[in-house]
């Protein structure tokens, strides 16, 4: 139940060593840079006494790298979209030093400029193409007009060109037929419009204009100096030129796909550098030296010192170590969990709820064995467990996984074992019952039948819940005793243990072994414990009646324990439900004709069992966590710690480890 002990490490070194030291501690990913000033008042007070000291101001460099990062991310997105198939890189492991050796800022800037130019050129071509497509569409409709639309100068007539909606065509032509002095010719008809040329006398201009407006006649806006057919050919030629330019640019762009991994590594480096630049803002700087304060886990101290001394000789750096003050423990100190490799994957359950405070017990080791049992009991299938085991091993051995995903793989790898064990106990293999004789030997499985031993499984679920509640209360009692809150430890822990054990003895003595002595002992123990719960608040309170009321109300909490125990019946319900569903899927396929059973049936079994595995794992994960958070943690755990936040890399594309 370990929370890492923290020390405050202060570093004083020459200003030129700052970058190397920050890179060294970032590569370790186990050092949190501490904010020296918690308020502007503290900063001002120090400056007033030591005017040569000032907080590091690295915003200019920070802005530079943030701008470069934004440009790079935009172009990575542009490259990915342009590839049409999505670009990816294989995840690898680097040290921070190896990673930063792949980075060349000058070369990157050159690539960024070239790619930006290609991107802008492609955008401009796209815009020009859209314009030409619109022009081509317009000119294609008028290409059979063999005169320049805007250059007809007639002495006594006007010539107009334009279009009307096809729905108005019949009535428009009928109206024009009433004007024998108006000549009209249809040039083209599209799906929705008809295109006309009209010639009419100047003295009829007003009447014809009114007619055209009545039918929403849209005049042609022509901007070319050549006839439409010639202009149409010119537009097509320009369009072909743009297509060739676009093809050449895309070929040039495709050549940059080979540099995708380089760009991804550059982004990783920029993310790391930005993290360091942000950390620099917490430093104190003089003209020739700097001061850096950090939180470090005590167990990592030797490794941290070694890494720093690799960058800076001992005689060129001053290091001091201090234990956290009481005020820092209450307000500032981070919390890092320290457990063995078997328990570490289960830390994520604690983190999802809340980290413990610095001086509080870590509930993860106490919670882990119960979660193992509960998860296995709720999934309880040999086949499902073997599948979990196989997939977890493949994921861990065949791939370099992101840390979060690796922790999940470790988590399900461990959980596969109780799933297999409970599968044997229930005698279930992908929902099918184990044969009574295996390899010529009579099988002892199932130990418990999900059809015949439902009540036994139900009682077993409640017993497991009872044990977990007892463990939670014992942890609470020990914590309160260590804090010398002895009356509270009795009232909030040991008395409730007495009630639980007393009630257990009552049940066993009355219903199981039929022993009056056990029954009487249980009644006495439960009664004395109940009296303690009522009396202790009276002792602690100056107002005795108020204390009595508080004690009686506290005793009412026994109903909550009944509810807690009932909650554990879900272990039985989910385990039996998952097995029954799997068995039903098998029966469904068995009813199929032989031909369908060994063709469609196999595919159907795979799909249905995949669905049941997903639902079983999800249900066990959620309900298992719920039992820990509500029933178990509620007995002793407060939480509220601040997570340890070391200076590290983002690890977006690679894993960074100290080599």
Regions found by a protein language model. Name each.
Residues 2-7, 14-22, 26-33, 293, ...:
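Conserved, carboxylate-rich catalytic/transport cores that coordinate ions
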Residues 1-367, 395, 402-405, 409:
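Long, charged N-terminal accessory/stalk domains
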């Amino acid at each position: 139940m370990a929370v890492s002990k923290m020390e405050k490490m202060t570093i004083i070194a020459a200003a030129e060593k700052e970058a190397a030291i920050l890179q060294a501690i970032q590569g370790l990913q186990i050092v949190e840079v501490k904010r020296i000033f918690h308020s502007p008042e503290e900063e001002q007070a120090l400056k007033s006494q030591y005017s040569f000291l000032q907080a590091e101001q690295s915003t200019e460099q920070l802005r530079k790298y943030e701008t470069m990062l934004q440009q790079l991310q935009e172009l990575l997105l542009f490259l990915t979209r342009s590839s049409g198939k999505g670009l990816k890189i294989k995840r690898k492991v680097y040290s921070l030093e190896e990673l930063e050796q792949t980075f060349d800022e000058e070369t990157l800037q050159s690539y960024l400029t070239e790619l930006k130019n290609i991107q802008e050129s492609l955008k401009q071509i796209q815009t020009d193409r859209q314009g030409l497509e619109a022009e081509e569409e317009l000119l294609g409709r008028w290409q059979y007009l063999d005169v320049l639309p805007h250059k007809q100068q007639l002495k006594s007539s006007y010539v107009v060109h334009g279009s009307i909606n096809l729905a108005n065509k019949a009535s428009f032509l009928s109206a024009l037929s009433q004007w024998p002095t108006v000549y009209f010719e249809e040039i083209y008809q599209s799906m929705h419009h008809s295109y006309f040329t009209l010639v009419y006398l100047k003295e009829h201009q007003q009447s014809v204009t009114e007619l055209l407006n009545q039918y929403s006649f849209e005049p042609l806006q022509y901007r070319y100096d050549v006839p439409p057919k010639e202009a149409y050919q010119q537009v097509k030629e320009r369009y072909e030129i743009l297509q060739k330019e676009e093809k050449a640019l895309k070929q040039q762009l495709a050549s940059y796909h080979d540099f995708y991994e380089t760009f991804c590594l550059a982004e990783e480096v920029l993310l790391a550098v930005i993290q360091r630049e942000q950390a620099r803002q917490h430093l104190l700087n003089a003209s020739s030296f700097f001061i850096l304060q950090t939180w470090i886990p005590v167990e990592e101290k030797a490794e941290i010192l070694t890494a720093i001394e690799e960058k800076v000789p001992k005689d060129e750096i001053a290091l001091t170590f201090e234990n956290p003050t009481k005020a820092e423990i209450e307000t500032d100190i981070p919390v890092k969990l320290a457990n063995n490799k078997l328990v570490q994957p289960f830390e994520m359950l604690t983190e999802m709820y809340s980290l413990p405070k610095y001086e509080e017990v870590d509930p993860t080791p106490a919670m882990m064995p119960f979660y193992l049992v509960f998860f296995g009991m709720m999934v309880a299938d040999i086949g499902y467990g073997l599948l979990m085991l196989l997939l977890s091993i493949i994921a861990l051995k065949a791939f370099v996984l992101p840390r979060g995903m690796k922790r999940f793989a470790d988590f399900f790898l461990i959980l596969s074992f109780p799933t297999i064990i409970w599968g044997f106990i229930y005698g279930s293999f992908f929902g099918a019952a184990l044969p009574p004789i295996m390899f010529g030997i009579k099988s002892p499985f199932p130990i418990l039948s999900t059809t015949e031993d439902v009540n036994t499984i139900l009682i077993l679920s409640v017993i497991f819940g009872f044990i977990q509640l007892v463990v939670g209360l014992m942890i609470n009692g020990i914590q309160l005793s260590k804090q010398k809150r002895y009356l509270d430890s009795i009232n909030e822990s040991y008395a409730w243990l007495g009630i639980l054990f007393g009630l257990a003895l009552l049940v066993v003595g009355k219903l199981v072994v039929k022993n009056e002595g056990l029954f009487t002992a249980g009644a006495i123990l439960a009664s004395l414990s109940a009296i303690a719960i009522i009396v202790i608040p009276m002792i602690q309170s100056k107002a005795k009646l108020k204390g009595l009321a508080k004690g009686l109300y506290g005793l009412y909490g026994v109903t909550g324990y009944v509810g807690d125990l009932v909650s554990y019946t879900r272990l039985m319900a989910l385990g039996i439900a998952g097995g029954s569903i799997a068995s039903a899927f098998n029966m469904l396929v068995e009813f199929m004709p032989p031909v369908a059973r060994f063709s469609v049936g196999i595919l159907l079994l795979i799909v249905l069992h995949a669905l049941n595995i997903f639902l079983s794992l999800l249900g066990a994960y959620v309900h298992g966590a719920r039992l820990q958070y509500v029933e178990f943690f509620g007995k002793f755990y407060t939480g509220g710690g601040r997570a340890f936040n070391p200076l590290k890399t983002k690890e977006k594309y690679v894993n960074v480890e100290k080599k």
